[in-house]
Amino acid sequence: MNLTDTVATILAILALTAGTGVFVAAEFSLTALDRSTVEANARGGTSRDRFIQRAHHRLSFQLSGAQLGISITTLATGYLTEPLVAELPHPGLVAVGMSDRVADGLITFFALVIVTSLSMVFGELVPKYLAVARPLRTARSVVAGQVLFSLLLTPAIRLTNGAANWIVRRLGIEPAEELRSARTPQELVSLVRSSARSGALDDATAWLMRRSLQFGALTAEELMTPRSKIVALQTDDTIADLVAAAAASGFSRFPVVEGDLDATVGIVHVKQVFEVPPGDRAHTLLTTVAEPVAVVPSTLDGDAVMAQVRASALQTAMVVDEYGGTAGMVTLEDLIEEIVGDVRDEHDDATPDVVAAGNGWRVSGLLRIDEVASATGYRAPDGPYETIGGLVLRELGHIPVAGETVELTALDQDGLPDDSMRWLATVIQMDGRRIDLLELIKMGGHADPGSGRGR
């Protein structure tokens, strides 16, 4: 091989490496682009953007074309490298006593390492990183060439696609021609968290979006006000009794029951007081103004609960358990607070549900386990309970009195028991048989000998 042939071969290898880079860049830029971004740019962009749109609509075909192009250019690079390596001189190695066979092998090895490394770096890694970092800009530069190549080799691409699809079907899997663009709520939550960490979303927006996306995974049982916290009025109560109950409790909505909450006949709102003249309020029964009550099962998901509550007359629904008994009541305010946080008015208790206290937190016993995790970092194991108060009751095994403590098992980020971290719960206040307030303290390792279960 003369000098001219050697130079031509080297230039051809460089050109093939660049071709590999074009196909790699096209593949990664097309997969990195979101469909909504592609469509938006195509509507108001240049002809290149519309070219990208057409390629994105046939993404599976274009990716197969890119793979075929990468294979062809890589094989051609290897084919041209072999004679070039064979012509490399090795008299220096022979002069130091190395045999021709060993010298040929050594030179071939190092030459292939150099060529392969250059091809990998400049033909694959650099284009890939550029495409991932700047997908739209990269696609505008390379997709036209990629589409033209795929058009010219359409028969070969369809043949290889058909063979691959046949094999995949034999494995019991139906091939997907395009990448899935829809995302589940869990995937969207992960994207929101990543965007917040990178600074693309501010913390407040990310927090609101996460809670909105996670809302549908909650159930009516998790969203409701529990039965023990409901103030009910009887069917023989009057409008005057409604006024007194609203003043005493600070609530605005009350179920009207016949005996107990399992026999709820309607819902009244304090605003209905103004529909009755003052002189008639003492003898006007609540049943005359009560609205029909909506009923939802405790297992209904948050989105469905929202729809039913919004459709009800007073934006309130009673929640029933699997046995048909009333488990609680859910209002539109409950649902909104689950998304935006506490919405307090002049009638609400000013005490927040979680308060930092010394080296721990004072939390309401009615807080759900996931709310405790968000506020304090304590991750509880799964169990037959919904609230932190329920967890403590289960661990104690009896109805406690104020001052009792119990050591709680914690989970790590992978959901496995974390023996290196323990938490101590102390009952601060009881409300009848319900834990109203408790204190959580994070402790390294096991609790000290002075603490224990049910002390």
UniProtKB/Swiss-Prot annotation:
Which positions fall inside the CNNM transmembrane domain?
2-205
Q: From what superkingdom does this record's organism come?
A: Bacteria
What's an example GO cellular component term for this entry?
plasma membrane
Q: How does it sit in the membrane?
A: Multi-pass membrane protein
PROSITE patterns found in the cross-reference section: CBS, CNNM
Family matches, as Pfam families:
CBS, CNNM, CorC_HlyC
Q: Which GO terms describe its molecular function?
A: flavin adenine dinucleotide binding
Which keywords does the record carry? CBS domain, Cell membrane, Membrane, Repeat, Transmembrane, Transmembrane helix
Q: Which residues form the CBS domain?
A: 224-285, 286-346
> Which InterPro entries does the record associate with it?
CBS_dom (IPR000644), CBS_dom_sf (IPR046342), CNNM (IPR002550), FAD-bd_PCMH-like_sf (IPR036318), FAD-bd_PCMH_sub2 (IPR016169), Ion_transp-like_CBS (IPR044751), Transptr-assoc_dom (IPR005170), UPF0053_domain (IPR051676)
Checking Gene3D superfamilies in the record gives:
3.30.465.10, CBS-domain (3.10.580.10)
| Record field: transmembrane | 6-26, 68-88, 106-126, 148-168
Signal peptide: which range, if any?
Answer: none
Q: Where in the cell is it found?
A: Cell membrane
Q: Which family does it belong to?
A: Belongs to the UPF0053 family.
What PANTHER family does the database record attribute to this sequence? UPF0053 PROTEIN RV1842C, UPF0053 PROTEIN YRKA
Q: Please report the name of this protein according to its UniProt entry.
A: UPF0053 protein Rv1842c
Write down the species.
Mycobacterium tuberculosis (strain ATCC 25618 / H37Rv)
